[in-house]
Design a protein with these regions (language model features):
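Conserved beta-strand positions
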Residues: 25-27, 52, 113, 136, ...
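Extracytoplasmic "Venus flytrap"
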Residues: 25-34, 53-59
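Glycine-rich, positively charged N-terminal anion/phosphate-binding segment
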Residues: 60-72
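Histidine-acidic metal/acid-base catalytic patches
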Residues: 1-8, 13-22, 32-45, 146-149, ...
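Residues that line or immediately flank small-molecule/substrate-binding pockets and catalytic motifs
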Residues: 54, 85-87, 115, 190, ...
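Active-site acidic/histidine proton-transfer and metal-coordination neighborhood
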Residues: 15-17, 37-39, 49, 56, ...
Length: 264
């Protein structure tokens, strides 16, 4: 990755100021690159928090290969905050367990998942054997199961508290829902967040660097602080796939600026 190799890699990530919203990377942003370059790019962004997509640790890996992946992240000083989106769409307990075993082997505390109304109870049951949080990731109008976070939340009201949502703010706004209201409604079931910015909040193809679009990032961070949100806001940078780092650096700089402004 040319951009990553051109940026000095710091030896230690920036320690967040207490009270700041913690920001990290969704490795889908580095989907065109190897695990080693994903690690290098994440370190260049000066954050320890990484939520990995399968590109960087394959589901079909052997236990030894997953151990190697885990060691690679640990040696780099990165914290695996979760993985996904992991699709658990089958009404099949054995299939669901394969993903929990994958997450357990990598030491993931959480999985962001795609699910169905039928598979959710099976996932909840399996969770109790693994103590891994489950965050349903919404995917907007094209998602026939859970377009908005509230679509998943209404099925979770009596479920284990380790069942929650990963709110993708871009997909949420495209449903026409108020993203701030969706965040507030999630409350303690908000386990994770994927952030992006759009120049047109209804158009998935209008993604821009965070801070350059219409996403109410400042208001989102204010709401997260008000809720005492303990999770991570992961940048999911879906544009400029062949050279994502410059735009990711700009996005991180903007979000760090928002954090700084909200400390007063």
């Amino acid at each position: 990755m040319a951009a990553a190799s051109a940026v000095p890699v710091l030896n230690a990530a920036v320690d967040p100021v207490p009270g700041d919203v913690r920001i990290g990377v969704a490795s889908y942003s580095f989907r065109e690159f190897s695990r080693s370059l994903c690690i290098k790019g994440t370190k260049a962004l000066n954050t320890p928090y990484l939520c990995i997509k399968e590109f960087h640790a394959l589901y079909r890996s052997t236990p030894q290969e997953l151990d190697k992946a885990k060691a690679d992240f640990q040696k780099a000083g990165l914290t695996l905050t979760g993985g996904g989106t992991v699709y658990m769409l089958k009404d099949d307990m054995a299939d669901i367990k394969t993903y929990f075993e994958y997450a357990k082997r990598l030491g993931m505390p959480m999985m962001n998942i795609g699910a169905t109304a039928k598979s959710l109870p099976m996932i909840e049951k399996t969770l109790k054997d693994y103590d891994i949080q489950i965050a349903v990731h919404n995917h907007g109008p094209e998602d026939k199961h859970f377009p908005a976070p509230s679509d998943a939340l209404k099925l979770m009201k009596d479920m284990d508290p380790r069942m929650g949502v990963c709110i993708d703010v871009g997909h949420t706004t495209r449903t026409g829902k108020n993203v701030l209201e969706e965040i507030q409604a999630a409350g303690p079931r908000l386990l994770d967040m994927h952030i992006k910015d759009l120049s047109d909040l209804m158009n998935r193809d209008s993604q821009v660097d965070v801070g350059d679009g219409q996403m109410p990032v400042v208001a989102i961070f204010k709401q997260l602080k008000k809720m005492n949100y303990k999770g991570i806001v992961h940048l999911e940078y879906e544009i400029n796939a062949d050279n994502p780092l410059p735009g990711m650096q700009k996005s991180f700089a903007y979000m760090r600026g928002v954090n700084a402004a909200l400390r007063a």
